[in-house]
Amino acid sequence: MTKKDAVIVYGAGISGRGAAQVLADKKQQVYLYNDMDCTLEPQLLQLLQSVGGGLAIGQAAFESLLDIAGVLVLSPGIACDNANVLLAEQRGLEVISEVELGYRLYGGHIAAITGTNGKTTTTTIVGEMLKRLPVPSAVGGNIGLALSKEVESLPQDGWLAAELSSFQLEKVSSFCPDIAVVLNLTPDHLERHHTMEAYGEAKKNIFRQQGEAQVTVLNYDDPIVRTWGAETKGRLCYFSRKEKLQQGIYMQDGNFIISWDGKQKTVCNISELHLFGGHNEENVLAAIACGFFAGVSISDMADVLRNFKSIEHRIEYVADIDGVPYYNDSKATNTDSTIKALEAFKDGHIILLAGGHDKLTPLEPMMELVKEKTDALILLGAAKERFNKAAVACGVPNIVLADSFEDAVAKAHALAHKPQVVLLSPACSSFDMFKNYPERGNYFKKLVHELEGGNVK
């Protein structure tokens, strides 16, 4: 990163603030720019000012910065076709993502995980596995702190488990992780990427710069992701829960098996784990691949897996009320994630709460499963009318429209009885009602616990 030209970090969220702080710590003149008014922590503002930078707000400020800056660092929430991004490119600035910045500042090892669903669970498991190595490790990216901030204290021999979204992978040019994982690809974020092709191209950036010294881990069971094996220059490792692989990570009779260079090693059996659902089997397979190529022992990987509990907001058990279990799956921000949640409950009888900020993805595949698995579908949020139309078209019975989030939970409680389960799995982002999916999930849990305590009728 040049010390001659100023750097603009676009977006004052978690990633943007982290990137700006790291650059300022390295004595780089950096301006944190935001379209709307915002307030910085006094310590961060003083740090930026100490290197000749600061906080910039509004269009006029942005355009003036283009005269002194050579690099524009994008926070994940800033789209590549944003007018200011295009203007910066026209003015000759190099535009990179916060992940690319972090990679350039870090010389250590990275296991990078992307995919439409399963990223957080897989990355969290990998992070626990990396802790078993005799070197420092951390978890960052789309989970926890900004990647550039997380790697600041890691040494050259350290390991980072990085969860990466398609947004974070849009503007990378030299990013080359030691291990690159693609879990799956299904429609998501089409309001930003516009087409599945563009969405997939962003995901591929995770392995584009890899060579023979790196490993590309792909889901053999995903028909799209499987074909990407022909495009990587890294060593290819497939994982599969359906096929026995001569070279790769697979399942057989419930066992997770590593087959590599003619040797087979069993890590553990699915019956030993606290995770359930086919999607989690895929997550475990991918995590085993990461652990294996990072040098984690079989016994350590097995121990991590046996002790790992489901992450918060992903099919998270909340409470049992009158024999009816309630589950929080607020992290299901797209239809495929909700499909995986529905499939995890093999007996069906689900009271499903869905809806929120509409991502405009196709609904028919999900609604076909909703018709099969649910006893009632409760719709809420900005997406409820489109969801209702799709559900009716697919013949889903017992559709209920809720006036609010609270009304949806109350209606679910009124309808539910043994042997049913109540599942919040919105298939939508949360931005119509909440700051993010954790806030939505925590509010759901609060309402359920109030019902459990008899405080809400």
Feature locations, PLM:
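Beta-strand->loop->alpha-helix junctions that form or flank phosphate-binding loops
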Residues: 56-59, 96-100, 233-251, 302-306, ...
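C-terminal helical cap/extension that packs against the catalytic core
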Residues: 43-49, 364-420, 455-457
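Short internal beta-strands
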Residues: 29-36, 216-220, 351-354, 373-382
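Nucleotide phosphate-binding/pyrophosphate-handling subdomain across enzymes
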Residues: 3-6, 16-26, 268-375
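N-terminal leader/targeting and accessory segments in enzymes
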Residues: 1-97, 101
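Residue-level signal for inorganic ion chemistry
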Residues: 23, 72, 113, 142, ...
